[in-house]
Structures are given as C-alpha cells and as structure tokens.
C-alpha cells in the first residue's frame, strides 16, 4: 500500500487497500471459523481425549481473538503508518492492552479461565473498533463490505455443513470436517465471485489454454 500511495496517490492507495483487505478477509475469516469448528477433534489429536473437552472449548475464542488481532495489525493499523501519525498509532495500540487489563480484573475473579478468554477476545474487538475509528483521521482505508458479506455467507454455509457432519472423533473427524469445510467454502466463494476470485481464475485458465494452443505444433 505504501508503494501504491507513492506511485498514484490516494486513488491508487484506495484500490490497493481494497484488494488487500478483500484478500485478507477471504483468506483469514474461513481459517478462523474453520479452526473454531474443528476445535474438539483438533484438541483430541493434540492433547488426547482426556483433556479435549476443556481444550476444545478454548479453541474458538483463540481463533476469534487471533483473527481480530491479525486484521487490526496487518490492515487497520496501517492507516497510521500511511498517514505518518506515529503518536496516534501508539495510542491506538494502547487501547486493547488497557481494555484487556480492565476486563481481566473484572471477569477473571468471577469466571476464571472463561473470563480470561472472553476478555482477550473482547479487548481485541475493542482495539479493532478503535483502530477503525481513529484510522480514518490519519488515512481512511476502505472496508471491503462486499467481500466481507460474501465470505460471511460462505462461512455460515461451511459451518452448517461441518456441524451436520457426525462426530467420528480424533484425526478422522478432523480430516473429514476440515476437507468438507474447505470444499463448501471454496465452492460458495467461487459461485459468488467474492473478490472477483472466479473472474481471476477464469482469466488464468483461459490464458493457460491460449498458451497451450500456441505451443509447438
């Protein structure tokens, strides 16, 4: 995005940011949702059946917190770098840290580990909102609403398919559900042409076919 801003100013930056944000959403949102969906069989494989119940319940919250943190760090906070607003960046990074401390003090004494998980996810959510709001003062970045909605729909259908699959347990369930989820998500995203993905795939295939036809006779 820095190169786009230097080459073509804010119009070029907007196009580059839109493309980057769309790609990020289409790639990371299903990864986070998929991780949450296979939390129990993943825990069975990683820590064994005895500890899988507790560990499986932790995975969805880790996935949510990780996704919010990634979107904030690798997209939303870039507004301050592009706008050369270092002090605002520092202030914005302090928001989730402060929120986490406050929520930990409030929730952990009452809810224990669950409270820690809730406070972590909530603090990253607060940080994302703060970065989005303050970032518009530094360098407004577009929100890829179309890709976000299409990815959300694809994730919902993926979740429905995975949740409808019987629980085989262990590595078999993990492989089956992960494969099914990836297949459903990929088909829906291609069908909706989210982020222009289907158009790009079609263009690449047509280009390869044209090259093959022009090959040695």
Regions found by a protein language model. Name each.
Residues 57-84, 88-108, 113-135, 177-182:
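Short runs within selected transmembrane alpha-helices of multi-pass transporters and secretion channels
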Residues 38-43, 47-52, 84, 107-111, ...:
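Short helix-capping/hinge motifs at transmembrane helix termini and TM-loop junctions
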Residues 19, 54-58, 116, 143, ...:
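Residue-level signature of transmembrane alpha-helical entry/exit and packing/kink sites
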Residues 163-217:
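Membrane-proximal transmembrane or re-entrant/amphipathic helices at the cytosolic face
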Residues 33, 101-105, 156-171:
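Hydrophobic alpha-helical transmembrane segments in multi-pass integral membrane proteins
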Residues 1-94:
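Specific pore-lining/lateral-gate transmembrane helices of multi-pass inner-membrane transport
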Residues 92-101, 149-161, 209-210:
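Small-residue-rich segments of transmembrane alpha-helices in multi-pass membrane proteins
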Residues 6-12, 135-151, 199-204:
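Interhelical loop/hinge segments that connect adjacent transmembrane helices in multipass membrane
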